[in-house]
Amino acid sequence: MSVGLKTRLLFASAVAALIAVACVGGGGGDGDGEDTSEDRLTFDDLGLDDRIPLYTESWNTDWTKRTISLSELIAGIQRPDPRDVIPPIDDPQFDTVEEAAQWLVDREPVVALELEGEARAYPLRILTSHEVVNDVVGDRSVVVSYCPLCNSAVTFDRELDGQVLRFGVSGLLRNSDLVMWDRQTESLWQQITGEAIVGELAGTELEFIPSPIIAWEDFRAQFPDGKVLSRDQGIFPPELYDNQPYAGYDSSTQPFLFRGTTDDRYPAMERVVAVRIDGAGKAYPFSVISEERAVNDEVAGTPILVVFGADDTASVLDTGDVKTGRGVGVGLAFERTVGGRVLTFDALGEDRFVDRETETVWDLFGNAMEGPLAGEELTPVVNTNELWFAWAAFNADAPVYTGSSTTSTVGY
């Protein structure tokens, strides 16, 4: 059985959604549902696959407004209306750290969000079956999203011009990446970029909020009073989340539901730290930074530090049980300016780093542990640990770090 078919069958059993590929043709359409004018553009006029109107005929999406060719979209779920067949979480329930420790294992990955004085963890074992969580943290309305096919965990502010949007899973994909939809305008949004690509809000971009993937044991140590997305959401039985639907996916050589040519500079399924600052981006392949451990660089004029560690952090895309997923590590990125001074970092043993200017020792999460700057924290920059093919598909012209940093490893 191929990895793709295995993935499809497992996912069907997990979320009752049979994946079926349907490529769409190019052009725009009129989504008002009326058929009173001979001049009205129909799906047939636009050359779209005849299955697409079946899937979307009840939508109020304005197909005439778009920033992409509709030929780039794939219908991923075979239902008359595929929206939210993969159910988003709209009223998230949380466990305490102590409660979550009863069912999470130390090395499994979580999305870590620290905002408005609160810290929350969203285990990937849950996000693989929901992909979208509409949440409120402090006074901020956010959407925490995860696309398993791209391993992209991205959090956005979902308030736009005074209106709070509520997001769901459209059932469509582009470059294998989740396409979200909002229920207020029925616009379609690219998960990996936060841009509305079709509909009333086409061209609008959501604000990124840093939310790295880290190991559960590290979240627990950093935020003992944090909250953890519960297994008991009233949607699926809690034990369902023990079985992961994407077993073997990131060991394959090609992405699933990807229509195009992958960039062969790196293996398609290699993870990269994807840094985004002020509209600029740069990728740092795990195969490179896992050797250097600390990279001093600059993106969009901002001096940054990219670090690699927690090597045993499990992949949620490797086996059916995240407890046995192979270790892939995590990559994180921070601004490296503290108190107006740009620091230069070297790796110092496992998950520790030292700056040359003050010889302060820092941990993997940007906390100064020992030395003159003890107690200081580095400011995170927006970064994800997505798969190379996805980064390259959306950022073909962006630079890629290839090594030869000024960093050295001290005692590593």
What are these model-predicted stretches?
Residues 25:
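Short, conserved catalytic or interaction motifs in soluble domains
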Residues 19-22:
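C-terminal motif of bacterial Sec signal peptides marking the signal peptidase cleavage site
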Residues 28-412:
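Mid-to-C-terminal functional-domain signal that highlights helix-capping/loop sites
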Residues 2-11:
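Bacterial N-terminal signal peptides that target proteins for export
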